[in-house]
């Protein structure tokens, strides 16, 4: 969904048929407002906020940038426009910034806990309907990378696919003839044997799903000895407390759905000058 379309729908959702305050406002006037943080975090949502302000005729006097850290009471944005319009966009603007910054802030905590320049932290497709682009953009601002945006990015075979595949190697040979040349094939594995079979069958990426650190290390050792070109990804209930141990297991990437679905709004408010 285009950013402008997304924002128009978000604003329409809040405005309905119009802000009733306009009916009782005797005279409109120019006003200045500040968006301030009420807790610390990592700023995200700048691109969406600026587009929202532009489409509603509000001037952004000053803003901090995506990926910048902030503290309580910091001024994040200074905006100026018609008093009535500032009030119209207030909740939509805050929702965007709070949600996006919440994801970026939690993601940054996982990046810090990961503590590795070699292992990439990835998000997942566990996103809210119609918010995937927005939420994955927020993950990038927190310092992680995106996994697949959709089913058309790469072929990923999970247990629900594999239970109907009798010969994995033959299936992958068939798949490569029908996929774009650049498309990767990733296979989700829940044991050492499944990971070994996936590598032997020709997978580009093997996901170690819900495996212990020790099991993941064993798979990484086998990969290093026999298929060093295969990428390994760890996934499944990996927390802030366990992510560093998985980073040391020999994998190339770690995917964490919690970056998005466990993130909470960062508290902010907008006040008139």
Curated annotation (Swiss-Prot):
The entry's keywords: Glycosyltransferase, Pyridine nucleotide biosynthesis, Transferase
E.C. designation(s): 2.4.2.19
UniProt keyword NADP, yes or no: no
GO MF term (any one): nicotinate-nucleotide diphosphorylase (carboxylating) activity
InterPro entries, per the entry: Aldolase_TIM (IPR013785), NadC (IPR004393), NadC/ModD (IPR027277), Nicotinate_pribotase-like_C (IPR036068), Quinolinate_PRibosylTase_N_sf (IPR037128), Quinolinate_PRibosylTrfase_C (IPR002638), Quinolinate_PRibosylTrfase_N (IPR022412)
Pathway given in the UniProt record: Cofactor biosynthesis; NAD(+) biosynthesis; nicotinate D-ribonucleotide from quinolinate: step 1/1
GO terms for cellular component: cytoplasm
Name of the top EC class for this enzyme: transferase
Binding site for substrate: 91, 124-126, 148, 158, 188, 209, 235-237, 256-258
BP terms from Gene Ontology: NAD biosynthetic process; quinolinate catabolic process
Enzymatic reactions: nicotinate beta-D-ribonucleotide + CO2 + diphosphate = quinolinate + 5-phospho-alpha-D-ribose 1-diphosphate + 2 H(+)
Parts forming coiled coils: none
CDD domains xref list: QPRTase (cd01572)
Pfam families on file: QRPTase_C, QRPTase_N
Subunit structure: Hexamer formed by 3 homodimers.
Function: Involved in the catabolism of quinolinic acid (QA).
Homology family: Belongs to the NadC/ModD family.
Protein name in the entry: Probable nicotinate-nucleotide pyrophosphorylase [carboxylating]
Gene: nadC
